[in-house]
């Protein structure tokens, strides 16, 4: 029986787990927290698909074209085609396992418009689609747990891959309760560790997603891809702790963006520039337009009747009332762009295998399907679909040889123990917050050469000092040992952004304002002993 180690228990990790278990493989599903606390539960808007009986005259080909166009043609057509062709079956599967979709007046799954799409094709569960899918998949995981095919390991954090000569044989995980490292050997390891929110501090996402796994595997030889493409969601609301996402569903239901001019009159700037559908341009376009107004921007949905708002946007109503005392049935929502999604991550082939054999990546930590900008509604689809693709690929592989890494485990445990006996030079939180400030200031919606160089120099200072920074014993050891990997990833993101001398999708350069034909390829970056090597994937080495 094949053994599969999946690290991360959000939607992509659970999708891969139930698909592997369904094919008779034994799965260890490891994560720091239960699935109910994964970032996946925060996904509000919906999941894209073209169903056979749709009344929109929509087609799978239209979904493919919209996805490729929305990604500024950097996503691979073959992988996107597989994603879109499989979407209808995924909606049916999710219904079958208990996902409670909102229904239209004919009792069928309801769908609405989302940005950058030529037809209404985003199916939803109110404004809590992620929660519903997590709940349904969680029940499937429990079913396979009862059958002995899935074993959950909670309180486990990724430490490093067990990699030799470009092949992965397992991973070392850190136990939060034991403060010990443990080696897990497997025929395949699947990373489902999410995006890079900690790099930027206040984002719409969870700080569980810190990018460390990608940074550490990058240091261990994995190729990363498209790191410069960072999606700023155009409609987020400021709160004390973070930026709260105001779902694209609000604009899908007719929400209008505006600012006030000198006469205190509303200017519907998106409609003025792009016509009636202006509010539903792609996220990169809307964020850039908000940035260029230089004004306070508002999103208004108050013209809809209260019954419709309560039925279709209940979570948005409750969110605004709870955190800002705003009644969206009566007044507009103050919004601004904020870091939301990372199109870049571990480079994977169409079967989700990384540059390291037997190491796979799914969900937001994998760079596939979205190109230079993700369409709303495609991330949940990619999470469910990608987990299945990886499971299929793993099932076709022969069981690999076993190599033990006992000396490596012992050495890493000794390093951890010795570090715990030191006294902190700087508080972990101080360094983390400073890194986030550097990234926010130098990797905004619009970037320029000087700011990118400044950011690289500041991150380099911390990287060079990493060996002298002692552990902060006021936090979990995980936060201490993960810091160097996060710093290396931050430097790689800045390096890729400086390398791409054009404006495409979510990447905008002040000095290079147009799309350049010479950059019509994904960015690949490798790491070797402190050296960062960037190139364009002109040969279609990954995602075709």
Model-derived features: positions:
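Conserved redox-cofactor binding core of oxidoreductases
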Residues: 95-180, 185, 192, 233-240
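N-terminal Rossmann-like FAD-binding beta1-loop-alpha1 element of flavoenzymes
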Residues: 4-29
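Helix-loop-beta segment of a Rossmann-like dinucleotide-binding subdomain
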Residues: 73-77, 108-134, 197-201, 297-307
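Conserved N-terminal glycine-rich FAD pyrophosphate-binding loop of Rossmann-like flavoproteins
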Residues: 33-66
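An anion/pyrophosphate-binding glycine-rich loop and adjacent beta-alpha core
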Residues: 216, 222-329, 393-399
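Glycine-rich loop(s) and the adjacent beta-strand/alpha-helix scaffold that form part
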Residues: 188-243, 377-393
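Short beta-strand to alpha-helix junction loop
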Residues: 75-85, 123-139, 203-211, 236-240, ...
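Glycine- and aromatic-enriched mobile tails/lids
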Residues: 2-3, 34-36, 42-43, 47, ...
């Amino acid at each position: 029986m094949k053994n599969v180690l999946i690290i991360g228990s959000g939607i992509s990790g659970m999708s891969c787990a139930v698909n592997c278990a369904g094919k008779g493989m034994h799965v260890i599903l490891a994560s720091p927290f239960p699935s109910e606390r994964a970032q996946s539960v925060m996904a509000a808007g919906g999941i894209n698909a073209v169903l056979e009986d749709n009344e929109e005259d929509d087609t799978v080909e239209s979904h493919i074209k919209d996805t490729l166009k929305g990604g500024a043609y950097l996503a691979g057509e073959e992988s996107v085609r597989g994603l879109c062709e499989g979407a209808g079956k995924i909606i049916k599967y999710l219904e079958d396992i208990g996902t409670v979709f909102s229904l239209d007046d004919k009792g069928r799954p309801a769908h609405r418009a989302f940005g950058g799409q030529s037809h209404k094709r985003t199916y939803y569960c109110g404004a809590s689609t992620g929660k519903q899918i997590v709940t349904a998949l969680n029940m499937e995981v429990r079913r396979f747990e009862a059958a002995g095919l899935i074993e959950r390991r909670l309180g486990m954090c990724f430490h490093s891959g067990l990699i030799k000569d470009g092949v992965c044989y397992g991973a070392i995980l850190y136990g939060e309760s034991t403060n010990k490292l443990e080696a897990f050997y497997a025929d395949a390891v699947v990373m489902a560790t999410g995006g890079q929110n900690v790099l930027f501090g206040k984002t719409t996402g969870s700080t569980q997603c810190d990018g460390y796994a990608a940074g550490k595997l990058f240091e261990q030889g994995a190729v990363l891809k498209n790191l410069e493409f960072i999606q700023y969601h155009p409609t987020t609301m400021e709160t004390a702790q973070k930026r709260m996402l105001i779902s694209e569903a609000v604009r899908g239901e007719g929400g209008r963006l505006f600012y006030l001019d000198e006469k205190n009159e509303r200017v519907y700037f998106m409609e003025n520039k792009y016509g009636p559908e202006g509010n539903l341009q792609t996220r990169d376009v809307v964020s850039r337009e908000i940035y260029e107004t230089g004004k306070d921007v508002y999103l208004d949905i108050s013209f809809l009747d209260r019954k419709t708002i309560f039925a279709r946007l209940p979570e948005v109503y409750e969110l605004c009332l709870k955190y800002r005392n705003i009644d969206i049935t009566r007044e507009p929502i103050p919004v601004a762009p904020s870091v939301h999604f990372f199109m870049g991550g571990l480079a994977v082939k169409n079967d989700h295998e990384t540059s390291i054999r037997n190491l796979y990546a799914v969900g937001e930590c994998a760079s596939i399907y979205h190109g230079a900008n993700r369409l709303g509604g495609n991330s949940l689809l990619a999470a469910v679909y990608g987990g299945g693709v990886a499971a299929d690929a793993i099932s076709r592989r022969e069981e690999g040889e076993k190599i033990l890494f006992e000396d490596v485990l012992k050495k890493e445990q000794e390093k951890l123990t010795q570090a715990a006996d030191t006294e902190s030079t700087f508080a972990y939180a101080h360094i983390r917050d400073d890194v986030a400030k550097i990234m926010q200031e130098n990797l905004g919606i619009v970037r320029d050469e000087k700011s990118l160089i400044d950011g690289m120099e500041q991150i380099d200072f911390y990287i060079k000092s990493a060996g002298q920074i002692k552990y902060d014993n006021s936090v979990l050891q995980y936060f201490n040992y993960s810091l160097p990997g996060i710093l290396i990833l931050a430097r790689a993101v800045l390096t890729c952004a400086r390398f791409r001398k054009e404006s495409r999708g979510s990447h905008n350069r002040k000095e290079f304002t147009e799309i350049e034909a010479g950059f019509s390829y994904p960015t690949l970056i490798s790491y070797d002993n402190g050296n960062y090597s960037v190139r364009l994937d002109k040969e279609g080495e990954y995602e075709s």
